[in-house]
Amino acid sequence: MDVIIDKNSGYCFGVEFAIQMAEDEMATGEPLFCLGDIVHNSMEVERLAKKGLKIIDREELKKLSDCKVLIRAHGEPPETYQLALENNIELVDASCPVVLKLQNRVKASFDAIDSKDGQIVIYGQEGHAEVIGIAGQTGDKAIVITTEKDLDKIDFEKPVTLYSQTTKSTQGFYKMKDLIEARVAEAGKNVDENFEYNDSICRQVSNREPQLRKFSKEFDVVIFVSGKKSSNGKALYGVCKQENERSYFVENETEIEPSWIRATDNVGICGATSTPMWLMEKVQNYIQAHSWN
């Protein structure tokens, strides 16, 4: 039995940067708060909590003053920065550069089309931290769509500008883009004049899709390691499952079922851009040490 970890799996640079910033700040001995889970992986959140990172939500942020708060890679809406200013909160800003660039693009688009009664549409997960930050650039006027059913939120009589959450699947984005184009045409509008789309998916994420397709085909079984909250994890696991029916999603090694693996199987281990390498190594060690039928 071979048990191989995908060399392309593990943190994207945005998550790696945020975790490094958190560890550097905690090394000074000063208290550090983080607005939301620093990464959508409960095992890593737990590891950093043991080092002293205190996770807070937006309601708790409103009660803080004179302290340090980390902004995670997902980014934040403008009101978070305003609140920090008012309450003398020092922000340690670990917003991913790719997300910040997207926020700026969305704000520029919104400023350009708002007077023309146009609509900013975001293909993403409602309530996701990154989407909250992006929608905040439009004063929360952006329309968030996740499924085809959500297209009914859009007024196809008015211009539409489409963006994507950076961690969504490329396939899903282009499917949504085609559906919107069709609906604009059905409304009797000129598609070129009334619809603009922007593929704002992070290339480190989209490049993982073809890599994972290839990786998944090379093994009898694929164990995909990710936090259940990870949007990117759900998308990439879907890619594995398309290519290899014997792909399984776990948060850690304790979730592996005995029936999944046979003694003669070659096993591939991979994960989301929010999955730490140490966790995949833990899964690898567990499989190698276990007796399989």
Swiss-Prot record:
GO terms for molecular function: 4 iron, 4 sulfur cluster binding; 4-hydroxy-3-methylbut-2-enyl diphosphate reductase activity; metal ion binding. InterPro entries: LytB/IspH. GO terms for biological process: dimethylallyl diphosphate biosynthetic process; isopentenyl diphosphate biosynthetic process, methylerythritol 4-phosphate pathway; terpenoid biosynthetic process. Isopentenyl diphosphate binds at residues 40, 74, 128, 230-232, 274. Pathway: Isoprenoid biosynthesis; dimethylallyl diphosphate biosynthesis; dimethylallyl diphosphate from (2E)-4-hydroxy-3-methylbutenyl diphosphate: step 1/1; Isoprenoid biosynthesis; isopentenyl diphosphate biosynthesis via DXP pathway; isopentenyl diphosphate from 1-deoxy-D-xylulose 5-phosphate: step 6/6. Keywords: 4Fe-4S, Iron, Iron-sulfur, Isoprene biosynthesis, Metal-binding, Oxidoreductase. (2E)-4-hydroxy-3-methylbut-2-enyl diphosphate binds at residues 40, 74, 128, 166, 230-232, 274. The active site is at residue 130. It is an enzyme of class 1 (oxidoreductase). It comes from the Bacteria. The keyword Transport does not apply. [4Fe-4S] cluster binds at residues 12, 96, 202. Binds 1 [4Fe-4S] cluster per subunit. Its EC number is 1.17.7.4. Its cofactor is [4Fe-4S] cluster. It holds the Pfam family LYTB. Dimethylallyl diphosphate binds at residues 40, 74, 128, 230-232, 274. It catalyses: isopentenyl diphosphate + 2 oxidized [2Fe-2S]-[ferredoxin] + H2O = (2E)-4-hydroxy-3-methylbut-2-enyl diphosphate + 2 reduced [2Fe-2S]-[ferredoxin] + 2 H(+); dimethylallyl diphosphate + 2 oxidized [2Fe-2S]-[ferredoxin] + H2O = (2E)-4-hydroxy-3-methylbut-2-enyl diphosphate + 2 reduced [2Fe-2S]-[ferredoxin] + 2 H(+). Belongs to the IspH family. Catalyzes the conversion of 1-hydroxy-2-methyl-2-(E)-butenyl 4-diphosphate (HMBPP) into a mixture of isopentenyl diphosphate (IPP) and dimethylallyl diphosphate (DMAPP). Acts in the terminal step of the DOXP/MEP pathway for isoprenoid precursor biosynthesis. This is 4-hydroxy-3-methylbut-2-enyl diphosphate reductase. It comes from Cytophaga hutchinsonii (strain ATCC 33406 / DSM 1761 / CIP 103989 / NBRC 15051 / NCIMB 9469 / D465).
